[in-house]
């Protein structure tokens, strides 16, 4: 990617946002195994700011519990769903590897998001999504799912692909939403689709924004318990005042619970929570944010976005982050899965996982 990063007021709309947040929310977890089932993970691109101090990563519990402060989160206080992923397959196959205990403790124990990417799959997507959401519901946990099928995805770079047309994407969107069930679920909407929109011409841009609004509407219509978060890039990319109008065009005020920042990137939690607050202020308030803390434990390495060395996992996933306006810290990118420079994008690297775990 050449752009920064990897892998959305009138009074009636303001009121509707408040009503949507008041319904309560859910935490997220991740099925890494479904990342394999669904396809690849996104590759971030980053520019900019030099690293700033990051808060220390929290201890590594296997479950999240507790009661969120009233009025501070759109998500319910639930355990995050931990699905099988590439890291678990590697751990199962390599129990004697000297790296395995640390990787298991710091990465394998944590809930991570489940991506639905790879090849266009209208015939199977409903079942794939339902397998995740039904397993999470049976466990009484909150899944985090990531639809990643927008046409012209990643501007044709490391994670290029997506649906063959916007008409095909509209069909896929309805089929994706049909698998969400009726229990709480976090949907992180199409990473990079808004931050990388400048690579499109005017017609493609309009079609993309309509498609994002259509997917968000399909999700919330199919499952009123779903919470949709729109990707906004990160703090060293688009200015809050610049990205906010695009989010509005994509339907965030009608269908969104909030925004997602730092997906597949390395920006510090401090920088990202401040950025999220500024974006939400530009949108008129009343929305929340989720921050991807999967690889930001010691911030970025300058402007390097693609498999930079020496990075660490950040704050553990939780729906009780203790930061006003932030609904959750999530591991949206799966630690140990590559950005595309040290190996195929989305492939699991035990060497990278061990490094991220502090080895």
From Swiss-Prot:
pH dependence: Optimum pH is 8.5.
Annotated disulfide bonds: 155-199
Domain of life according to the entry: Bacteria
Active site feature: 154, 192, 339
Biased composition annotated in UniProt, kind: Basic residues: 13-24
Residue stretches in coiled coil: none
Role, per record: CMCase I preferentially hydrolyzes carboxymethyl cellulose (CMC).
The name this protein goes by in its record: Endoglucanase 1
Gene name tied to this protein: casA
